[in-house]
Amino acid sequence: MAEGTKYHISINVNTAYLAEQSDPAADRYVFAYTITIANTGTVAAQLISRRWIITDAENVTQEVKGLGVVGEQPLLQPGESFEYTSGTAMATPVGTMQGTYQMVAEDGIKFDAEIPPFTLSMPRILH
């Protein structure tokens, strides 16, 4: 079996602008993102840590690293998924996030699950 199939994690992202927590007059734009992490490989894998690159519309980049997600290090059997919601604040109404989750498979192999870039946008900003 190909290694790419054995160790494979799919990531799906949905975003929302949180108007009630944002203050555009103070350049504070708050977004929530809901991520579904699915083990589409053939071996169990545990999410150990995360690394985010957050970039605003002025190309200001922030790197965020930490253990797990929302206080958890989920162990995903093949076919299982884990969903969580978190958030971030930026100084601009549009930005992007991308990154990686470091995973450890049940056989001890470490691998990164890429989080593809996604856009955070205040409604009616992007056309």
Descriptions of predicted regions:
Residues 3, 36, 51-53, 100-102:
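Residue-level detector of beta-strand face positions
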Residues 5, 25-29, 44-46, 75-80, ...:
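A generic structural micro-feature
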Residues 29-34, 98:
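Short, solvent-exposed loop/turn segments enriched in Ser/Thr/Gly
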Residues 37-41:
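Asparagine-centered strand-capping/turn motif at beta-strand->loop junctions
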Residues 43-62, 103:
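Short acidic, flexible loop segments centered on an aromatic residue
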Residues 89-127:
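Terminal connector regions
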